[in-house]
């Protein structure tokens, strides 16, 4: 798997500071066999640490003039086939535990509003139809997932990272990040711990078409705590599925801002353009069935004026 981000500046930038959430973790559903991070131009050092939520992050700075920057994270990941869930506690049981403060802190912290997911009565009402009396939490969360998939339209031009959740709910258009926020807001409104998950989604080409390198996607979904036995269970409202073998988890937090793949500050540089390419490829497909150098459907052109 490769995640490549390239920046080009119209004028030389003098300084750049960057914080990366690009290290794929080993979890109960995936294991990482290899990871490499490269930055061009090469910084003097790249520092790694674990953040508050347990994600591994990297920091680096460029202090020499540069006209562009490329960050590439490459991972080899084994994704396990999930075990089907046949039973789960009722959502009321879990909500009652949350009220009694019996959840450990690492779970309880996901009960509360966050910067991008505030208390919204409309989301409380939205979730009530799924969370009926004595309903198992997994069943209820799956219905919420289906409702979001049905009620919201995917539109990459409708929102950006600064669009308030209130506007997303009002217009019912957005992208995976927005749909994850809607689900988390509805779950927290029922007293259930829910967190934001960033990651990747492997896509399949249309029948008869070659697989395009770079055509996979950065992705996001939500996770709900389903008790000590099941732990965190992930749901993808963009695709109306429980997370499976095509999903690779990257990081988790309260909302998007906690786990943005790349955060940084650049001094100078004038106008900049950014291009992102993501490729998730089975190992047995690396030598055939792909079209190298194809334009990524996930590539973005972004221009902004640095101050």
Regions found by a protein language model. Name each.
Residues 1-125, 129, 134:
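Linear, non-domain "peripheral" regions
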Residues 146, 152, 178-270:
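Hydrophobic/aromatic-rich core segments of domains that either
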Residues 20-26, 30, 35-37, 239-260, ...:
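Glycine-rich, small/acidic residue-mixed loop/short-helix segments
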Residues 275-277:
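Hydrophobic/aromatic scaffold residues of ePK-like serine/threonine protein kinase catalytic domains
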Residues 26, 43, 75-77, 200, ...:
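A broadly conserved detector of short glycine/acidic/proline-rich loop/turn motifs that flank catalytic sites
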Residues 293-295:
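A mobile, often basic/glycine-rich helix-loop segment
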Residues 93-174, 182, 254-256, 280-286:
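Secondary-structure boundary elements
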Residues 288-290, 305:
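Catalytic-core signal marking the mid-to-C-terminal active-site face
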């Amino acid at each position: 798997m490769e995640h490549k981000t390239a920046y080009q500046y119209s004028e030389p930038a003098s300084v750049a500071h960057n914080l990366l959430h690009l290290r794929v973790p080993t979890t109960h559903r995936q294991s990482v066999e290899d990871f490499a991070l490269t930055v061009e131009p090469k910084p003097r050092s790249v520092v790694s640490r674990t953040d508050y939520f347990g994600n591994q992050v990297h920091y680096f700075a460029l202090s020499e003039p540069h006209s562009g920057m490329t960050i590439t994270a490459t991972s080899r990941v084994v994704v396990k086939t999930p075990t089907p869930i046949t039973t789960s506690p009722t959502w009321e049981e879990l909500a009652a535990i949350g009220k009694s403060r019996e959840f450990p802190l690492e779970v309880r912290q996901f009960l509360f509003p966050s910067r991008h997911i505030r208390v919204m009565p409309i989301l409380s009402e939205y979730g009530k139809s799924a969370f009926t009396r004595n309903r198992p939490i997994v069943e209820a969360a799956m219905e919420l997932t289906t409702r979001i998939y049905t009620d919201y339209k995917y539109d990459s031009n409708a929102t950006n990272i600064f669009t308030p959740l209130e506007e997303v709910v009002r217009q019912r258009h957005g992208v995976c990040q927005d749909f994850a926020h809607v689900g988390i807001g509805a779950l927290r409104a029922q007293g259930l711990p829910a967190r934001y998950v960033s990651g990747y989604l492997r896509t399949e080409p249309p029948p008869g078409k070659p697989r395009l390198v770079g055509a996979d996607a950065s992705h996001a979904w939500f996770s709900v705590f389903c008790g000590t036995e099941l732990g965190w269970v992930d749901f993808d409202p963009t695709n109306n599925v429980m997370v499976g073998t095509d999903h690779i988890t990257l990081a988790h937090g309260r909302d998007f801002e906690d786990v943005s793949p790349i955060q940084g500050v650049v001094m100078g540089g004038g106008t900049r353009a950014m291009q992102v390419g993501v490729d998730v490829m089975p190992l047995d497909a690396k030598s055939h069935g792909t079209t190298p150098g194809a334009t990524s459907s996930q590539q973005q052109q972004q221009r902004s004026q640095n101050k």
